[in-house]
Amino acid sequence: IGVAKAGAKNVICIVGDGSFMSNMQELAVIKEHNLPIKIIVLNNKGYLSIKNTQGKFYDGRIYGVNKATGVWFPDMEEVASVFKIKAGRAWSIKTLDKYVEMAMKQIAPYLLDCVCTEDQIIMPAQTFKKGQQAPLHDMFPFLSDEELQQEMVVSL
């Protein structure tokens, strides 16, 4: 929102549906100021990062991450409609280009709901390394120690 308010012509926000659920109230600000923000929602119908973490650390027991485990997510096009923001839905990679092109032509806010698989493995991911919890800057798949040091902006 800040980048758009500063005058950027097209701002693209790529967000998962779970994260979007925590911030959808910002659509009111986007609409009120008619900000040219394109919101691309990667929709896997749940909290996929949490689901992957639970599956990894809790012997496959999954709770509160999707409809099957007690959490319902609204239709993203309907959410956009409530805020009077135009929206579209890409059901497959074959239709994605068409909808991205349509979104980018809009001078007003636009929400693109991209339907994704519900079983995607999320990477990079925080995990254990050498028997200890790896720090946030060192996620799986791991870089070599040399490459990690080279990519860091601060010394390790």
Regions found by a protein language model. Give the residues of each.
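Thiamine diphosphate
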Residues: 1-156
